[in-house]
């Protein structure tokens, strides 16, 4: 309970009013430091076996949603990091969003995004690659941005410094390791490449 007193969890209603809570059904919280804030907007998503881990001075926000969010893992152990997920987010099963162990990293996911199975979003590689010539770290972490209304299919991975433009569809088993910056497009492959433009999508089965 001590760590919960040094950090804050809020439910936020439709009018923006905050209520401090110590429990949200379907979400396990683990605070490794102090001064972190988690905000979950109402109406709450249907959380199922989700976990949020925060270090020092971290911020996590999840928007309101009528959809199921199953096995979301938000790992922001690195200090001064943030993860923001917009409203109407859905997750079929298992997504890890990782900013740890580096500091000052951010992941942003826009509104009305649909994620499939086994998604991995990494703002950091987790281990150093070092130049033998001068000792420089060659693979420092970078922010990740996913726009609004993106459909991300199963077994997808997005790596540090990558972006996905709004309205995009990313195919199964794709790896995004750069800028997918053409809106309303289909991307697929490893690395993900532009396959089709001028599209939109919805959640209904054809």
Describe the residue ranges of each PLM region.
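ABC-type ATPase nucleotide-binding domain
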Residues: 153, 171
């Amino acid at each position: 309970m001590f760590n919960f007193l040094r950090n804050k969890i809020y439910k936020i209603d439709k009018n923006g009013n905050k209520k401090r809570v110590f429990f949200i059904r379907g979400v396990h919280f683990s605070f490794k430091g102090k001064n972190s804030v988690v905000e979950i907007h109402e109406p709450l998503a249907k959380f199922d076996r989700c976990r949020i881990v925060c270090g020092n001075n971290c911020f996590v926000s999840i928007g309101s949603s009528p959809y199921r969010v199953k096995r979301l893992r938000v790992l922001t152990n690195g200090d001064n990091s943030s993860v923001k997920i917009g409203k109407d987010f859905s997750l079929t099963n298992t997504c890890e969003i990782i900013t740890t162990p580096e500091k000052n990293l951010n992941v942003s996911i826009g509104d009305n995004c649909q994620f499939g199975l086994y998604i991995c979003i990494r703002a950091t590689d987790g281990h150093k690659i070092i130049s033998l010539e001068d000792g420089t770290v060659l693979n420092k972490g970078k922010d990740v941005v996913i726009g609004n209304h993106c459909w991300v299919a199963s077994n997808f991975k997005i790596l540090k410094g990558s972006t996905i433009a709004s309205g995009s569809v990313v195919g199964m088993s794709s790896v995004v390791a750069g800028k997918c910056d053409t809106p309303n497009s289909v991307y697929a492959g490893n690395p993900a490449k532009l396959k089709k433009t001028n599209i939109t999508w919805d959640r209904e089965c054809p």
